[in-house]
Curated annotation (Swiss-Prot):
Residues 1-71 are annotated as: Domain I. The lineage of its organism: Bacteria, Bacillati, Cyanobacteriota, Cyanophyceae, Synechococcales. Belongs to the RuvA family. This is Holliday junction branch migration complex subunit RuvA. It comes from Prochlorococcus marinus (strain MIT 9301). The keyword Cytoplasm applies. The gene is ruvA.
Length: 225
């Protein structure tokens, strides 16, 4: 059973929506399916093609051996948890991690965001419900940790401002910003609410939206969404 590989890149290619590398490890060539994000970094020479380390999930089938490579053990273990769900195959698991980060998936589970899960190719309504239900039980501690963190960061006593924040999140989502991006800037927005409220008697939703979009645009200029 192969669980970890370190070697040099020999080749990389794409077949439909599958992304592969050929790694030379001590004279042996290993064909490994990888995530699209890592594939693009290799193709654009953004990372070295020497001494590549991949955490590998080895799946044995009757007619073949499949290797799936990840840049972290956390990704690999998350992939394994997804595969443990009835009816979910390796390509669904890869599809989820191609489209979303682990934290985004956990947030979707927490909020029961079936629409987001269904946006992964191959996942329908019933499978999204099963994924949310079963992954929720598998990642209880992570979900509780996120909830406690959110409560600590986003606790606001004023119900009117709370409503503004909720509306702000929904508006930003409708403008195609990702949940991860929104969650990253919300604590900053909330810290500035007191200052805005003291300086201006008419703190409005429009001012919060403008402020949020300014921070999001600053982030997107450094990190492509």
């Amino acid at each position: 059973m192969i669980s970890w590989i370190n070697g040099d890149l020999v080749d990389l290619w794409q077949t439909n929506q599958k992304f592969f590398v050929l790694i030379n490890c001590q004279g042996l060539g290993y064909e490994i399916q990888i995530l699209e994000s890592f594939f693009l970094k290799l193709r654009k020479n953004q990372i070295s093609t020497k001494n590549i380390t991949l955490w590998v999930k080895h799946i044995k089938k009757e007619d073949s051996d499949l290797l799936f490579g990840f840049t972290s053990n956390e990704q690999k273990n998350f992939f394994i948890e997804i595969l443990s769900i009835r009816g979910v195959g390796s390509q669904i698991g890869i599809g989820i991690l191609n489209k979303f980060s682990i934290s985004e998936v956990i947030n979707a589970i927490k909020t029961q965001d079936k629409k987001l899960i269904c946006s992964v190719p191959g996942i329908g309504q019933k499978m999204s419900e099963r994924l949310i239900l079963e992954l929720k039980s598998k990642f209880k501690s992570e979900i509780l940790s996120e909830e406690e963190k959110s409560k600590g960061e986003l606790e606001i006593k004023d119900p009117e401002i709370n409503k503004m924040i909720e509306d702000l999140q929904l508006t930003l989502q409708s403008l195609s910003y990702k949940n991860k991006e929104i969650n990253n800037i919300l604590p900053i927005i909330i810290k500035e609410i007191d200052l805005l409220g003291k300086k201006e008697n008419n703190l409005s939703f429009e001012k919060l939206l403008k402020l949020a979009m300014r921070y999001l645009d600053e982030d997107s200029s450094n990190i492509a969404r």
